Amino acid sequence: SGSGAMKQPSLRRLRPICLSFPEAEGRETWGEATFRVRDKIFCMHIADADEPALWCKAPPGSQDILVGADPKRFFVPPYVGHKGWVGMRLNQRVDWREVAALVTRSYRMTAPKRLAQRLPAD
C-alpha cells in the first residue's frame, strides 16, 4: 500500500535523513520508499507493518560484522544481500544516530565523488 508506507513512523524519521544529502531524492519503487542519488538507490525503507526495516549499501565485510554482532537488529536482505547490503530492523528502539551513520556511508558509496565530497568529514 503506497499511502500506508508513507504513514509509517520509521519512514517519517528516515526520510529527512536520506533527503539531507546533495541531490538525493525519494521515489516509490516496488511499493517501497527508495532513496537515490543520480538514479542509484542508496537506501530503501521496507514498510512491513510488523517489522519495518531499512536496507542500505555497506562496505565490504561490514555486513558480516553487523549481522554477527547483533542479529536481532541487523540481517542480510533478500535480492541485494549478496552485494553486501545490510538490513536494519526499525521496530525496536532505534538509535537514529546509528541509522544516520549507516545511511551516510551508503550515500558516500553510491554518489559520484564530487557529491560525496560535499558531505562533512566523518
Language-model segments: which ranges?
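Charge-dense, helix-prone N-terminal extensions
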Residues: S1-D122
